[in-house]
Amino acid sequence: MEPSLVVVGLNFKTSPVAVRERFWMSELRRYEALHQLVRAEGIDELVVLATCNRTEFILWTSDAGEAADSVLRFLTHEYGLKMSDWSHFYRLMDDVALNHIFRVASSLDSMVIGEPEIVGQFKNAWSQAQAAGTTGRFLDAVMQKALTVSKRVRNETAIGNAAVSIPYTTVELSKQVLGELFDKAVVLMGAGKMSESAAKYLMNHGASQICVINRTLHKAQEFSEKVGGIAVALEDRAPYLDHADIIVSSTSCPHYVIEKADAERIQAARGGKPIVMVDIAVPRDIDPAVREVPGVHLFDMDDLEKVAKRNESERQVAAVAAEEILADEAKGFRRKLMAERVVPTIVALRNRLDEVCRQELESLRQELGPFTEDQDQAMTALTAHITQRIAGSLARELKELPERSEQDMLTMAVQRLFHLEQPQKAAAGTN
């Protein structure tokens, strides 16, 4: 079988947060997935991209069907994938997979079109795969090109300027419940980049009392210095939650950090005044049951998606221009990728022709006697020139075919006519 680019995954378009959080992967779990799956049948190169809005396996594979099955078997064994989950997953191949990867890196496939966070997440996923030794020359080329496309999209369109970010939607939802945010007390649970962005947005809209809660107090202190707030360890959070008007939670805890009983205690301490809780973590930090507590207004990633879809006209104009750039870049890269795919066959053909020429030269020497040095050099140069003419002509023909199906047919014909072994693993390529 010929090597293929494959993406297997799910995202916010195909699944609610309750499903996505089951397949979310921490950095450690991503390393484990990389090391396990790269040894699986059919998978030659692998990148795992896991964010709050998507979990995707980007594969360069010598057997697309077997590779996709290997991913599903892994998810079944490690994450309890059930038959009822299958409808949330997609499998994309070749041109469709390439377009998808470019759209993801350019934030055209994001919940918030134009949001900048995906670029860093994309780079981190690639760096992690490189560190794990699971990428080679093909996926490295794909990932590098995707980031180049992303940069061009941001430089040549207004896609970033038009983004309605998750921190922005946090402010909008808070204002809907609480009105103006002047003097509102804010608790940020988690000290990541998303929490920092949310803090800046909230402060720009009047919030002045910021409390940063984190499992690692040192990180909370570093964060609080940036925003002029106070730092609190996670285990000491209770009294600070009791006085919060807005709670934004984005930790990486594997369990709920605010449960229904916590919300009931908070509301008792607040006298039932309205409180906004924004859960931007996947897996979720806040038990959905807190919605049953009077006065609690809980918003999770599904709610933020609904807000992000409003007033999309400006972003859609920028997205149209971005899609044109993407199509142009994908076309050029696709040609390059198709040319790369036939290299192993051309190399095998050259080796085969060289072997035939050596055999024929040896037969000629035995028949005519030893050549002089000049004759030997001339005959060797002649056979090398013949090899170059034949292999070069076929290489140009194979590389310039517009459709993969035609390329596959001619490649197989060359392999059969010249008795070449199908170089499956060589075609996948590794560093």
UniProtKB/Swiss-Prot annotation:
The record's listing under PROSITE patterns reads: GLUTR
Answer whether the UniProt record assigns the keyword NADP to this protein.
Answer: yes
User: Which leading EC class covers this enzyme?
Assistant: oxidoreductase
List the GO biological process terms.
protoporphyrinogen IX biosynthetic process from glutamate
Q: Which reaction does it catalyse?
A: (S)-4-amino-5-oxopentanoate + tRNA(Glu) + NADP(+) = L-glutamyl-tRNA(Glu) + NADPH + H(+)
Q: Which UniProt keywords apply?
A: NADP, Oxidoreductase, Porphyrin biosynthesis
Q: Where is this site: Important for activity?
A: H100
Q: Name one GO molecular function term.
A: NADP binding
Against SUPFAM superfamilies, the record matches this protein to:
Glutamyl tRNA-reductase catalytic, N-terminal domain, Glutamyl tRNA-reductase dimerization domain, NAD(P)-binding Rossmann-fold domains
Q: What's the EC number here? A: 1.2.1.70
Oligomer status and interactors = Homodimer.
Which family would the database say this protein is a member of? Answer: Belongs to the glutamyl-tRNA reductase family.
Tell me the domain comment. Possesses an unusual extended V-shaped dimeric structure with each monomer consisting of three distinct domains arranged along a curved 'spinal' alpha-helix. The N-terminal catalytic domain specifically recognizes the glutamate moiety of the substrate. The second domain is the NADPH-binding domain, and the third C-terminal domain is responsible for dimerization.
**What's this protein's name?**
Glutamyl-tRNA reductase 1
Write down the species. Koribacter versatilis (strain Ellin345)
